[in-house]
Amino acid sequence: MALLRPLLLDNVASIQQSAALALGRLANYSDELAVVQNEILPQLVYSLGEQKRYYKKAAAFVLRAVAKHSPPLAQAVVDSGALDSLVACLEDFDPGVKEAAAWALGYVAGHNAQLASTVVDAGAISLLVLCVQEPELSLKRISASALADIAKHSPEQAQAVVDAGSVAYLAPLIAHQDAKLKRQVCACLSQIAKHSVDLAEMVVEAEIFPKILLYVKDVDQHVRKHAATVVREIAKHTPELAQLIVGNGGVAALVEYVGESRGNNRLPGIMALGYIGAFSETLALSVIASKGLRLLFEALTTEPEDHLKSASAWSLGQLGRHTPEHAKALADIGALPRLMELQASASSSEDLKVECKRALKAIVAKLTHLPALDALVQGAGSTEHAGVVNAVLAQISKVLPNDSSGRSSFVSSGGFAKVLSLPTEDGSETRESVDIISSCHPDEIVRFYSPGYSESLLKKLEA
């Protein structure tokens, strides 16, 4: 670094440029503070305003390479006074200089809200929106990416991006032929839409539906993922926005997307289906009718990553918590035993256990199908199941008094004996549920299936 710094001041322009490129490449692969410590940044910032376009590109490359590693290094770039010079470069006649500056600004803004605010305060947004309108593809991509990096941190920063008129220019670009540009545009729209209802409605009003749903089926998997993310970020806000997606055929597109994707690419689709189904029983039925349940269950069963299983469990819980019919649909595909198994598994993460437990409790609270409740009781083994078993017993105590045929099958299946064998404490909710269940059966049946009854009979014989 010490050897390269004097070359930045060389009289020969090509040597200056080569030195800057060398610095940029070194900084790009190392997060060491050498670039900052050798007072090279002020020299680069000065050169941004004075030198020719080739050197400007090289200098912006160095600033980008330094800023990308960490917030402290990005802050060092800000402290060197680079932002004003980089923003000025966005007005340069050379597209390459604009692109290099936009890229550096995006890296600075991407780290945290405070750094993004400094980029906003430097006046970058309106110029980045102008860059999106330029004919050069790479400049469009980098500018859209930089706007996304600004918008992602807070509603205020996303609103600043919207106020500059960005959505009107970004939205038509989702139909562009270039896959990388579509990817960046979708990423930016999703970062805007995620913050609030108003911002999501601004994105919707740019008439992205139903076009965006076509790109949930795009040949490029990254475009598909980012398009599904836009749908997810819009769906989560209100029933009206979720209904808009359903009305445009969004559920079928999302179900197909979840079925064809694997790994992390599935996550936006899984979450979007859960958000849509969470709002009302009608919207949940639209997901169930589109065969979404089986794909969510398949993800819960086959995906190796716990965070994907957690998302699937959450979505299943949102779909099954509305009515007995919704809950039975979950029971019919075998989702409840799997949720119970994951909730008690030692290999499951804490987040997965919590999501499975919440989903089970929400579904069981609406479940009136006695065979499914019976299966859950009999499948309960470890103390990890205790919280769920309490919810199941409470639900059985509500269902059983009104189901005479169910009482008989509950006894013959072994479910009643299992209930009586469960350890309970006097005065507990579990004890209360067991007493209600017992009161639905004749005393002879209760005695016969109570633990220790056979031993007491043998003692009578011996006597």
Locations of the language-model features?
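Intrinsically disordered, low-complexity regulatory regions
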Residues: V364, A394-I396, F416-A463
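Short, hydrophobic/charged alpha-helical patches characteristic of ARM/HEAT alpha-solenoid repeats
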Residues: M1-L3, I15, D31-E39, Y54-Y55, ...
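Intrinsic low-complexity tandem-repeat regions in disordered proteins
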Residues: L23, L41, A59, L63, ...
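Residues that form ligand- and interface-recognition hot spots within folded domains
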Residues: L8, L48, L90, G123, ...
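Alpha-helical solenoid repeat architecture
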Residues: P6, Q17-Y29, Y46, K57-H69, ...
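A structural feature that tracks compact, well-ordered secondary-structure segments
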Residues: C89, L130-C131, P172-L173, E201, ...
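Buried hydrophobic core positions in alpha-solenoid tandem helical repeats
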Residues: L3-R5, Q43-V45, S85-V87, L127-V129, ...
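Short inter-helical turns and helix N-cap capping residues of alpha-solenoid HEAT/ARM repeat scaffolds
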Residues: N11-V12, Q51-K52, F93-D94, P135-E136, ...
